[in-house]
């Protein structure tokens, strides 16, 4: 893309646009940092694995209403998941199109994608949890989900990968999870998936 259409963009302008489009939270991660420190170096989930031109990842959060987790059946949860993922994809796509209209190409990664060649399991091209942590939106809880101060673990994340060089947010220093002294996630897990702390 030629530079004549390129408009100067700041991280604050991009984040304000994402919020205007409907994101609940937004942060920015540096592609260089994500490339240098993949969550699992053996199976690198990095932006350069997708495109060598990515400079920044705009991380978008959509929260899941807490009330849906109080339902007796899974159907409302599944329906809300579907609605929220669709909404998040629309917000991210509109942001990518807006970035491009300002001369900064960008594209969306699917929040729920799987590359079956990696680990033979549900393992996407990017770890959205790690994107959120690097973008300063939250940190890991005992159950290894991202926790945000605003929504706890009840959220979905996606990323808009862009060629725009934006100032990255700093990872949170304060822990959202208070650790084993709380252990609410351990006791609430119906499958006892995190019982290894007992």
Residues covered by each model-derived region:
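Non-catalytic, usually N-terminal nucleic-acid engagement modules in DNA/RNA processing proteins
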Residues: 1-88
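Catalytic cores of enzyme domains
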Residues: 4, 76-198
């Amino acid at each position: 893309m030629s530079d004549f259409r390129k408009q100067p963009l700041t991280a604050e302008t991009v984040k304000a646009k994402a919020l205007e489009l409907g994101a609940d939270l937004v942060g920015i991660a540096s592609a260089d940092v994500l490339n240098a420190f993949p969550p699992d170096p053996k199976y690198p989930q990095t932006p350069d694995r997708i495109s060598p031109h990515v400079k920044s990842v705009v991380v978008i959060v959509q929260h899941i209403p807490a009330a849906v987790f109080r339902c007796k059946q899974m159907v409302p949860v599944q329906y809300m998941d579907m609605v929220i993922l669709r909404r998040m994809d629309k917000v991210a796509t509109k942001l990518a199109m807006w970035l491009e209209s300002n001369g900064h190409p960008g594209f969306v990664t699917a929040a729920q994608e799987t590359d079956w060649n990696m680990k033979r399991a549900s393992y996407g091209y990017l770890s959205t949890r790690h994107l959120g942590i690097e973008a300063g939106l939250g940190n890991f809880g005992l159950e290894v989900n991202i926790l945000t101060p605003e929504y706890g673990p009840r959220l979905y994340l996606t990323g808009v990968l862009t060629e725009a060089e934006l100032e990255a947010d700093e990872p949170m220093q304060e822990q959202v999870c208070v650790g084993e002294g709380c252990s609410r996630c351990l006791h609430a897990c119906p499958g006892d998936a995190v019982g290894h702390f007992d």
